[in-house]
Amino acid sequence: MVEGEVISGTVERLLFEAPDSDYLVFRIRRDDGALLTVTGNGVKPLQGDRLEIRGHGTIHKKYGAQFAASSWKRLLPDTAEGIENFLASGAFDGIGPALAKRLVTAFGAETMKIMMNEPERLKEVEGIGPKKLTALTASLQAEKDVNELALLLETHYISGRYAKRLLAEYGDEAAYVLEHEPYRMIRDIDGIGFNTADRIALAFGTDPTGTERLSAGIEYVLQEMTSNGHVCLPDDELVEKAANVLKAEPVHIRDVLNETLITGHLVAEDCSGLTYIYTVDAYERELRVADDIRNLAAKTSLKTHVNINEFIDRWQTEREFTLADKQREAVERSLDSGLTVITGGPGTGKTTVVKAIIALAEQEGLNILLCAPTGRAAKRLAETTQRKAKTIHRLLGPAGYVGEHPLFDHNRDNPLEGDLIIVDEVSMLDLELTDCLLEALPGHCRCILVGDADQLASVGAGAVLHDIIRSETVPVVRLETIFRQQEGGLIVTNAHRINHGGMPVVDKEGEFCFIETNDEDKGAHLVADLYEKEVMSTGGDIFSVQVLSPMYRNACGVDALNQLIQKQVNGADDAKAELKNGNILFRTGDKVMQKQNDYEKGVFNGDMGTVFALGNDSMHVRYPEQDIRYKGNDLGEISLAYAITVHKSQGSEYDTVIIVLVNSHSIMLQRNLLYTAVTRAKKKVILVGTKAALQRAVRATDKSKRYTLLAQRLKRDEIC
């Protein structure tokens, strides 16, 4: 059994539940009557559950004596009163308080023994017929299966908390998978990654140097690199990282990697003297994107009915406005190729160019599609052009998943209906979404990509905009002249100063100010005060003001700031309902954000809304286009959004942006992050933090290289 002390007691209260793991803190009353706080990872117990807990006693500096649990399992009660309470708690499907009372009245302290070993006797109790008995027997058997599998896990020093998930996925084969195919769990079961599967595999006797383990470790390292933005990885770097993770000899890793390549589970590509390793999915996506881009770029100039130069002259005259040379070039070239890139910083006239291109395309009678990666970016595109615009996801039509990858209604077999598509905020496009978008374009459709190449790269894998520009195989128009100097003039000026490595010019009371503080706790409270003040100045519009922080942790991180700001602008009130999910307390009126794409609900990563109703285990959120109900595990998709990370803000604009720059976030402070944060603001930027952090953010350039061969594939000749 699991080593350490064994205690038992009854759960009195759940004190804490982590939002992103199964870490719990709860209080039990030991069998000797003493109260004790238990900490550990496991299946959440119910109030009133009797538990047997393995672990050891600890002393917490703040909270005193605690019991650090390595595992726990539910004990069946052995008194009539305990059994009735246990059954009435909902432990078994189909048994409520009334039936629990009848069962205990019939069988007394023997109730649990009879239920587990002689379930056919339950027919003696009023209200239990053949159908009810069948359902109860199935529920009882499921409980026995969980307990037996949990015991099997614990005999190998693994917490029994995984038992329910394993049985739900594998049924009778769960024990076989544990002993013979443990790494299947990585792809089959949410919440079990390589590290957990590896610990279980080794406990059940997997050879540490065996092919199955090393192969799983190699794939894990590749997937981890994908989450850091890489599409592929040089083989030497992959071998080195895998050897460190697996504590194995590099020569053994290399042998297994070669075997994996031979079987086709991974793909190798030689380029410029290096060998790059891909997952099959990433390799095929990069090939498709390269082919689609080349095919688009190869389209010949559209034969227009309108003289473009005359059209531009007329368009300018009607608006009493003259395009700059590069702006005019962008409009002139917009229909020359099947694919055109228009890039430039804030205030360089990208929106004006897009308006002119739309007017030209409409004059030609073209069917135009407008889209952007996020809801707020699409909304802004619609507002500035006075045309319909959608997120890329909504344009394509979500149709579920294959594994972790999205499916869409529109694809190569069912293309979109359009002659010209304009995609804004393209710096946010990762390889996967680019692939889905390009394959949904009809053969005659032309594409214009608009974005700022100096902003943060996409959260997902790839560097699509950079790679297209770097390939020099697609027409690119760079807008460099700054026009927008009246509204947001200092913001635009400072954005360009920052982008070129210069310190921003600050105006203490104006549109770009810097409030210096070296105390991060005081700084956090200052940010909360500033947020409240700025929101009040707008008449209470919580969506016009946004706090941006580079990281989630520490006093000035997103998590702590959200709690502070919520307390200040939407504090506890008898008139407001509350719901706690994990470590996050929600109230009606809270500003919240969707954290991941949910194709079934039709809400996507970064969408913001307001909580307008809360239940015991449910939340209703009002988004600009719809109301969505969240329940149970779905609540984990939602977070408070008074403060968000800079990455989450991409594609959005706010009247006022409050940016936190503190020393504890130094690892994240880079020029493109600050540049992206500043360019989110339309009217006002408030920097809060230290001069040292500001200087670091301005001077530090992002030296990390994303491994991708898209640019080389577009050039063709550099792939060996």
Language model: regions and residue ranges:
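Loop/turn positions that initiate beta-strands
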Residues: 48-50, 589, 606
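C-terminal accessory regions
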Residues: 500, 607-720
